[in-house]
Amino acid sequence: MTNSQSDAALAAVPDRFDPSAGGPGAYDTPLGITNPPIDELLDRVSSKYALVIYAAKRARQINDYYNQLGEGILEYVGPLVEPGLQEKPLSIALREIHGDLLEHTEGE
């Protein structure tokens, strides 16, 4: 078998780890910063800076909620969406904002 024939034979074999092929090596839809889309999140606030503050405050509350669970104190509200396995508080906060699950007044 020549070099060009072996290259052609390899090209005919599908790559089972190619994410675009949709097989077992495919990636799940990303969550957090890329999903929900930033443009849709910006529709819910006045500026990208307001979005950063809003999401950071809520992520801090979610993080504090998880930290207080072991102490038996329930001062903070937990996630309002079903968190994924090892999903970060910021990703949860962005999904809550996207789902209009929070009330927000800018400047507070």
Curated annotation (Swiss-Prot):
Entry's Gene Ontology molecular function annotations: DNA binding; DNA-directed RNA polymerase activity
Chain segments carrying region Disordered: 1-32
Nucleotidyltransferase among keywords: yes
Residue intervals passing through the bilayer: none
Protein's name in the database: DNA-directed RNA polymerase subunit omega
A GO cellular component annotation in the UniProt record: DNA-directed RNA polymerase complex
NCBIfam families the record matches: rpoZ (TIGR00690)
Quaternary assembly: The RNAP catalytic core consists of 2 alpha, 1 beta, 1 beta' and 1 omega subunit. When a sigma factor is associated with the core the holoenzyme is formed, which can initiate transcription.
Catalytically driven reaction(s): RNA(n) + a ribonucleoside 5'-triphosphate = RNA(n+1) + diphosphate
Family as reported in the entry's similarity comment: Belongs to the RNA polymerase subunit omega family.
Naturally occurring in which organism (per UniProt): Mycobacterium avium (strain 104)
EC number(s) given by UniProt: 2.7.7.6
Role: Promotes RNA polymerase assembly. Latches the N- and C-terminal regions of the beta' subunit thereby facilitating its interaction with the beta and alpha subunits.
Keyword Transferase among record annotations: yes
Keywords of the record: DNA-directed RNA polymerase, Nucleotidyltransferase, Transcription, Transferase
EC category name: transferase
BP GO terms, sorted: DNA-templated transcription
